[in-house]
Amino acid sequence: MKGPKFCPTTRGNFVHKKADAKEFTRKLKLMEKFHDVQTNDTSLVKGKTFFQVNTENEELKDIVSKIERCDPISKDTQMNLTCGERKALDTLKNADDVVIKKADKGNVLVIMDREFYRQKLVLQDHLHTACYTKVDTDSDESVFEDLCTLLDKHSKCLTVKERTYISNSDWQTSNFYVLPKIHKSEAIKNAIAEQNSEYVTLSAPEDLKGRPIVAGPNCPTKRLSELLDKILKPLVPQLKSFVKDDWDVLSKLPQNCTDDCELLSCDVVSLYTSIPHELGLEALQYWISKHRNMIPSRFTNRFILEAAAFVLKNNNFHFDGDVWLQRVGTAMGTDFAPPYACLTMGYLEETKLKPKLLEFFTPTQCQFIIEHFFRYIDDGFSLWPKDLNLDHFMEVMNSLHPSIKFTFELGKKLTLHDGTEVTMLNFLDILIMLHTNGQLETDIYYKETNTHDYLPYNSHHPEHVKNNIPYTLAKKIIVFCSSRFVEMRLTELRTALLACGYPAHIINKGFHNARLQGPAPDPEKKKKTLPLVSTYNSNLDSKKVVSTSRDLLSNVKDEKLKRVFANQSPTLALKQPPNLLRQLTSAKFTSSPPCEPKESGLFKCNDNKCKLCRLFIQQCKSFTVADGTEWTIKSHITCQSKCVVYYLSCIFCNGKVTKTGKTNIFRKRMNNHISDCKSGDTSDKFDLHVHECMKKHNNFSKPYFKIYVYLEVSHPKFLIPYEDHLHTRNFDTISKRKV
């Protein structure tokens, strides 16, 4: 069975591989250009630039040329999905009566009836509660304007790069979706036990709840939230109850405790959507004042608080064509939400918990309670003395703030297979066992909904990634489990990995390295890596490009280049291709039928005020260039499009003088051409030519030139390989069919 992380084999994209190589050589030129430049840049966030840099170093020019001419090795990899499976995948992608989401916990996909998801999980359980309100219009444009005003107000707090990064974004409104919490549904647990199958079917479980997510990777406040996350995150480890992860829990858990203790866990009910803005900002004020020395001095308290308030109060999102606003709490999805929630809970523990505990317990008892309480965001764990009144503790916790409520669970007494009686309770992925003599043991914890469906070995992943999975999983077992449980869990893991297609020798090697606490260190890793970043594709292997780069850079003759690339080792850094989760799920939801694909060609926008479309753009589906070649446009392009390769033709010369170029935002570049043609204040030869023609013919009325487009790509870096073809117009390599 293929889980959500399974990657189908994809066909090789030669253009993308050449773009990756071009980006790598650009990195080499940047390293050479700025090697001796001293910088005191303290920016916590900054954007990536796409400008093309030139080098005067002849040896580097030769190296760049050889790397860019080195083609990836073409292979013919067998597809890892059958024809029937591919048809089924296409059917699921286009299904308009279901919604597919990843389960909140575990490697599981959940296929739900579309109306059940909309009415029950989203509207009834979330949007129709007091946390959210529907608004009439989309206010993101005014939010972005207010953001720029905020940045102007606190301009002294930000570097130029930070301010540019936050304010220069092509924002998009967020989308709302819900991840089903199948591990908390009794109906689903019962169905799993009854059906005992790789997949479980049941009808509309009423006890199914979900985790609300606001997906805003490009929302107006995203980059400001990213900066706040960098500022606040160092404060979180200062909290007394803080645990970083499972490994941290194990390091802080005592091996033994008194035999009169119980295991206790607690969980904050809907923490992210329960924190009132006033409480959260009060908590931030407390912590940034207490640990002022841990925050760069240029960030004033006022800026941090106003920026946090701005992110919290401008959380707009779309769902099913409507615009909503989250009124309470923070969006689970914005960058600074985890440290914000942690600091808020830490503030309540620091300022309210101990005084309230003293109403029921002695100072010594209070100290023990606080020292033996651990918390990971909204999950808490405690070793609780039996002689203390637990009801008083629960009363105290639920009185810390009217909006913050806890649920509690005590450990259950069970008998192990060897007859040993223990009290058991899980915290995160650890199962903690307390013996009657006070000894503590641990085991790895699997939820009842865990399918042990690990990444199939035939998934389209790099070999080293798949070969490392047995080691990683085995090491987790060896670290998490007390010695007497290790072999049993490793046997279970071996069975699961074999079922996923892993060769026995790969499993044995991984388990062996895990027992040794890791493979032998690789001396090559001592060198600084110089990554060539590329999406993995077994049909086009970029290892030859990397090995060529390594040979060229290790044998440079120029003294400056020797210093620049000293101890640098080019490596291949692989990105994951689209897996089933990415292909089958979407943050955007609409109950209306899917729109028909837009017609290919160059089209005018619907804005009557757009002079570019009204005077310059001619709608067309194909066009003829100066040499008589006709080109077909294969995507829907308007003045709003991005990452466009375009073609300009001077109207005064009947198309004899032309220009082919590339741009990120199409409208901005065209407006720049129009302005430069009119003024003549430019170094662009085409614009200067048009300007001279305008003077010669004494005609300054628009249009000055005709605009056509070749294609639109998904990312600015994919424009880079076309640079060599822009003036020759040899576009066969970019899959544009000549007509």
Q: Would you name each region that the model predicts?
A:
Residues 1-739:
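Charged structural interfaces that engage phosphate-rich ligands
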